[in-house]
């Protein structure tokens, strides 16, 4: 029994020792961080220590924590306290476990010693030393203590059957097994403790890192708040300040807290700021806005304000957080940048417009160059044809030869007119054509156009001119283009009218409805120089006829290029269909309008309306002889205010195929003559049209001349080698006949010359005069590279009684002028080696300086041989006349700008050459 009780006590002691190793409050004290299952009963193993939850920092919430200093600090404090508590609790638990293990081991060793001691005591073998010699005293004390316990117990008797050696041996073996099991449990527990320590160390690293990040973020936040030039604050739902931070405070904190913006500040922008905050609070959505404040406290400044709503845990809005930053300088810079961008945009737009202008200018220049090239290439060979035909007309020809020659000249004139029409049309469409503004008299222009048309008239028509009294005596406009329009329209009217009347009517009208802002193209400065006022007038011009009329269905396409009323009209009357198209474009270019009304078999009326500037009534043109060729050199009544003209074909029988002569009823004691035209204001006829050539036939005294004046007029033509007499004894000069026949042939008729006058006495006189003049003939230099043009010029000069030297380019011309003295130079513009313009500049430089240094610098070799004589520096200006096939107005201006004195366009005619020689040699 005693042994049984001992066994039970030992087992209870083992359980008690094992149970004491695990305190009952482990789970609660560790805040349930560890779940340790305590051993109970005969459980020999210890379950693993596991971690239910791991505290890991949520990095996504870190920015939210930083938005509020109080929240971040609170979270950080709680986290640190929790971590410290966990660490302290773990250390305490480990210490307790180690303490329990040590106590358990000591108890196990004590039990083992007790058992051994009892075993030795029962076997009476005290001489045997225990396993642990050093603990012999402990065994003796334990044995004595055991005896005392047994004696003081309830005196339970020990049965002898259990007090045997075998029993105690078995008991020792069982205790040894228990000791091994306890040792194994201790080893496993130590391993678990080591693993737990390692796990705790690994778990503590994120907590330390999070703590470090939080401290760093907090330091960064403090750094921003201390250095950023911003204002931060928190306001409740009534927009009263609960917190504010300002780097540069202008008010004390106690003056702000508990108040609204309106209660604190006064001035512009305050109410807007409060309304903006209230709007954000109501909508519950963060927003930002620039607001300019104008207050007495800090003046006018612009702030960028960012406002966000604040919610509690229940999701209710409790106020707002806001941040404000001054952006006044940025706003100013932004406005400057916007202004700069606007200026850059304007500059780019101007550059774009400039590039467009440059492109248009280049296109215009190319168009001009094309027109100049086209004119030059066509007119150059045509000059040879027309010039040679004109020279041939001055020779003795029979009737058939003269008819053929007239057809040749007429065809050449038609080709030239066609070329002029095409060039005019091209110049208008390409924008090359420029209008001139000069003073002229409308009555004289109308009279001149009608006289010219009557001179070549072969039909029984009456030409009328009717100018209203309110038409000004003198106006300003492009007289050459107006004459061109009138000439084309009156020519068409005559062409399609077989009998009846053709006329021109002028009248002043009020400003028409189609007027545009840019209707007037005249230059204001030029008008002021001419003494004009700003008064303008609209003049309506009607060109009417009683001809065949135009079908109504043909009117819409009448002004289109290369279009005629019908194919039958084109075959019967000819023409290219360009005349009306050119007239319409010229009228529109001058700011007017051209219309037509017509009825078949009743006639047509072409009406164009143009604006004109009007001069003062007492400021007439200085040149009272603008159309002196229309009147006799003797004094005549002034007809500048005359308003009605009428011309009838008094020489109609000349153009009839079978008529023998001129009826005395039509031409009593009078005959029609030709004479050169003096153009308005001294202007040379525009080389781009054939106006000057088509108007070569002029009428003296309204188209007639007395017989007494005939011989005098004929005497002015020494170059005429022959004279012819008609049936009535009237005589024509050969040059006059040639010009008249040329005009008549353009209408399809030929002028019949009936007989030749023998004037031997006149020839002898002319021969004597020629011998006298040979000693004083002027020296003329022709600078031309085209052999055909040289041949034509020589022949014309021969007809005019002159000779000339030839130079093929500008270098040869300079060499010739250096070695000889000339009275006149006819200079071609386009030549190889050295063109006419540059040669003229070098000649003018020589006249100014007396040396050829400029020519030498240009590479011209002016060295002379010993036999050549060097001409002295001329005292007078050498006349240099340009001869070119370029018909652009810029070409003539360029010639004048380079020092030339006049301009002759090709094809050169005897009339043009004669006028030039008369102007510069007489």
UniProtKB/Swiss-Prot annotation:
Catalyzed chemical reaction(s): ATP + protein L-histidine = ADP + protein N-phospho-L-histidine
Pfam short name (any one): HATPase_c
Residues with PTM 4-aspartylphosphate: 828
One GO CC annotation: plasma membrane
GO terms under biological process: abscisic acid-activated signaling pathway; cellular response to hydrogen peroxide; cellular response to molecule of bacterial origin; cellular response to nitric oxide; cytokinin-activated signaling pathway; defense response; ethylene-activated signaling pathway; negative regulation of abscisic acid-activated signaling pathway
Consequence of gene loss (knockout): Hypersensitive to abscisic acid (ABA) and ethylene (ACC) in roots. Reduced stomatal closure in response to H(2)O(2), bacterial pathogen associated molecular pattern (PAMP) flagellin, Pseudomonas syringae, darkness, nitric oxide and ethylene, but normal closure in response to ABA and the peptide elf. Increased sensitivity to pathogens and increased tolerance to high salinity.
Tissue localization of expression: Present in light-grown but not in etiolated seedlings. Mostly expressed in roots flowers and siliques, and, to a lower extent, in stems and leaves, especially in guard cells.
Keyword hit for Endoplasmic reticulum: no
Topology within the bilayer: Peripheral membrane protein
Modification Phosphohistidine, positions: 376
Enzyme Commission number, as recorded: 2.7.13.3
Residues given in the record as Mg(2+) binding sites: 785, 828, 830
Induction (free text): By H(2)O(2).
Disulfide-bond pairs as recorded: none
Subcellular location per the Swiss-Prot or TrEMBL entry: Cell membrane; Cytoplasm
Ranges where the Response regulatory domain occurs: 779-921
Region of interest (Disordered), residue spans: 620-639, 728-773
Quaternary structure annotation from Swiss-Prot or TrEMBL: Interacts with AHP1, APH2, APH3, APH5 and APH6, but not with APH4.
Function: Functions as a histidine kinase and transmits the stress signal to a downstream MAPK cascade. This protein undergoes an ATP-dependent autophosphorylation at a conserved histidine residue in the kinase core, and a phosphoryl group is then transferred to a conserved aspartate residue in the receiver domain. Negative regulator of the ETR1-dependent abscisic acid (ABA) and ethylene signaling pathway that inhibits the root elongation. Promotes stomatal closure.
Protein name as it appears in the record: Histidine kinase 5
Lineage: Eukaryota, Viridiplantae, Streptophyta, Embryophyta, Tracheophyta
């Amino acid at each position: 029994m005693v042994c049984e009780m001992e066994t039970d006590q030992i087992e209870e002691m083992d359980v008690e020792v094992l149970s004491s190793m695990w305190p009952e409050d482990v789970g609660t004290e560790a805040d349930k961080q560890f779940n340790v299952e305590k051993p109970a009963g005969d459980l020999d193993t210890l379950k693993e220590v596991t971690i239910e939850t791991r505290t890991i920092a949520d990095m996504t919430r870190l920015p939210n924590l930083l938005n509020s200093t109080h929240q971040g600090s609170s979270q950080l404090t709680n986290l640190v306290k929790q971590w410290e508590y966990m660490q302290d609790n773990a250390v305490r638990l480990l210490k307790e476990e180690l303490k329990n293990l040590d106590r358990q081991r000591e108890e196990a060793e004590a039990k083992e010693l007790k058992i051994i001691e009892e075993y030795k005591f029962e076997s009476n073998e005290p001489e045997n030393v225990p396993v642990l010699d050093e603990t012999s005293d402990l065994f003796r004390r334990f044995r004595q203590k055991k005896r005392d316990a047994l004696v003081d117990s309830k005196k339970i008797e020990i049965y002898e059957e259990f007090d045997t050696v075998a029993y105690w041996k078995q008991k020792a073996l069982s205790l040894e097994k228990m000791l091994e099991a306890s040792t194994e449990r201790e080893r496993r527990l130590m391993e678990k403790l080591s693993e737990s320590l390692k796990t705790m160390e690994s778990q503590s690293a994120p907590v330390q890192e999070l703590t470090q990040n939080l401290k760093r973020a907090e330091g960064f936040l403090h750094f921003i708040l201390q250095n950023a030039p911003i204002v931060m604050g928190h306001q409740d739902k009534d927009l009263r300040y609960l917190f504010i931070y300002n780097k540069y405070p202008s008010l004390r904190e106690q003056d702000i807290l508990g108040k609204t913006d309106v209660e604190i500040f006064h001035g512009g922008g305050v109410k807007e700021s409060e309304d903006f905050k209230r709007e954000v609070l109501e909508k519950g959505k963060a927003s930002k806005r620039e607001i300019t404040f104008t207050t007495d406290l800090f003046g006018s400044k612009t702030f960028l304000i960012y406002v966000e709503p604040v919610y509690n845990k229940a999701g209710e809005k409790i106020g707002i957080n806001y941040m404000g930053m001054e952006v006044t300088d940025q706003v100013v810079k932004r406005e400057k940048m916007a202004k700069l961008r606007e200026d850059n945009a304007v500059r780019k737009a101007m550059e774009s417009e400039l590039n467009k202008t440059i492109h248009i200018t280049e296109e215009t220049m190319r168009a001009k160059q094309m027109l100049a090239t086209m004119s030059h290439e066509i007119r150059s060979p045509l000059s040879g044809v027309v010039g040679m035909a004109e020279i041939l007309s001055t020779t003795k020809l029979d009737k058939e030869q003269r008819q053929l020659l007239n057809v040749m000249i007429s065809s050449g004139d038609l080709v030239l007119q066609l070329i002029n029409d095409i060039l005019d049309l091209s110049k208008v469409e390409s924008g090359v054509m420029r209008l001139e503004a000069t003073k002229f008299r409308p009555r004289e222009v109308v009279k001149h156009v009608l006289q010219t048309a009557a001179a070549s008239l072969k039909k029984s028509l009456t030409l009328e001119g009717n100018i209203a009294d309110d038409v000004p005596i003198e106006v300003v406009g492009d007289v050459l283009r107006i004459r061109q329009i009138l000439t084309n329209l009156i020519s068409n009217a005559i062409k399609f009218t077989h009998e009846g009347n053709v006329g021109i009517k002028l009248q002043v009208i009020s400003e028409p409805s189609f007027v545009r802002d840019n209707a007037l193209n005249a230059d204001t400065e030029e008008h002021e120089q001419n003494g004009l006022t700003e008064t303008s007038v609209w003049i309506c011009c009607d060109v009417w006829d009683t001809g065949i009329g135009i079908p109504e269905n043909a009117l819409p396409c009448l002004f289109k290029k290369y279009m005629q009323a019908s194919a039958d009209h084109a075959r019967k009357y000819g023409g290219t269909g360009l005349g009306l198209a050119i007239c319409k474009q010229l009228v529109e270019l001058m700011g007017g309008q051209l219309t037509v009304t017509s009825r078949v078999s009743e006639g047509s009326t072409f009406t164009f309306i143009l604006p004109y500037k009007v001069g003062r009534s007492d400021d007439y043109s200085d040149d009272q002889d603008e159309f002196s060729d229309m009147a006799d050199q003797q004094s005549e009544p002034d007809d500048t205010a005359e308003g009605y003209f009428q011309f009838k074909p008094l020489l109609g029988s000349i153009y009839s195929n079978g008529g023998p002569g001129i009826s005395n009823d039509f031409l009593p004691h009078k005959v029609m003559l030709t004479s050169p035209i003096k153009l308005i204001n001294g202007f040379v006829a525009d080389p781009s049209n054939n106006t000057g050539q088509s108007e070569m036939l002029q009428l003296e005294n309204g188209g007639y001349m007395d017989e007494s004046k005939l011989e005098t007029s004929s005497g002015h033509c020494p170059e005429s080698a022959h004279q012819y007499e008609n049936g009535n004894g009237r005589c024509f000069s050969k040059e006059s006949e040639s010009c008249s026949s040329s005009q008549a042939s353009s209408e399809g008729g030929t002028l019949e010359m009936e007989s030749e006058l023998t004037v031997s006495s006149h020839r002898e006189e002319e021969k004597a005069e020629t011998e006298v003049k040979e000693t004083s003939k002027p020296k003329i230099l022709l600078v031309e590279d085209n052999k055909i043009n040289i041949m034509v010029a020589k022949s014309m000069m021969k007809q005019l009684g002159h000779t000339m030297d030839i130079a093929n380019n500008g270098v040869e011309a300079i060499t010739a002028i250096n070695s000889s003295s000339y009275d006149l130079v006819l200079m071609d513009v386009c030549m190889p080696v050295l063109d006419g313009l540059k040669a003229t500049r070098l000649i003018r430089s020589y006249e100014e300086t007396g040396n050829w240094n400029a020519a030498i610098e240009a590479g011209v070799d002016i060295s002379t041989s010993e036999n050549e004589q060097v001409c002295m520096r001329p005292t007078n200006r050498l006349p240099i006349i340009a001869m070119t096939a370029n018909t652009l107005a810029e070409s003539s201006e360029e010639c004048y700008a380079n020092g030339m004195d006049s301009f002759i366009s090709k094809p050169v005619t005897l009339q043009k050459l004669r006028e030039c020689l008369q102007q510069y040699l007489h």
